[in-house]
């Protein structure tokens, strides 16, 4: 999945959920890094990180996707799907972080950098925080 959609002008506050679907401690740690990086990047862009989902204009969800690296390969590749949903549930934006990365090449630093880079595509909110 690639970046799709643009956050509408009424989105000023975003609740960031913890990433789901981690199958190992390393993926859980990378998910925590992704959450922190998303909050920091969104705030740096002028969005308000809502402390509660009910207070947010939209919710950013992250889900780990795990697959085999080819038909007969025992190696696994991972990617983190990020989806921004409006309160009503419609998708406003979606992107893939570290798509198709072999598990042994995944690092917290790479996740942090890629999350920040991909969320830049949202652009700034219309009236700041």
Tell me what each language-model feature is.
Residues 1-14, 35-44, 48-49, 85-129:
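C-terminal/domain-edge helix-coil "capping" segments
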Residues 16-18, 49-75, 80-81:
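A short, hydrophobic beta-strand-centered structural micro-motif
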Residues 19-29, 101-106:
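Second-shell loop/turn segments in exported
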Residues 24, 68-70, 90:
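Residue-level signal for secondary-structure boundary sites
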Residues 25-30, 38, 42:
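Extracytoplasmic/periplasm-facing segments of secreted or lipoprotein envelope proteins
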Residues 26-33, 48-54:
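A generic short-segment signal for beta-strand/edge and adjacent turn/coil regions
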Residues 29-31, 62-64, 74-75, 106-113:
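Surface-exposed beta-strand edges and their flanking turn/coil or helix-capping segments
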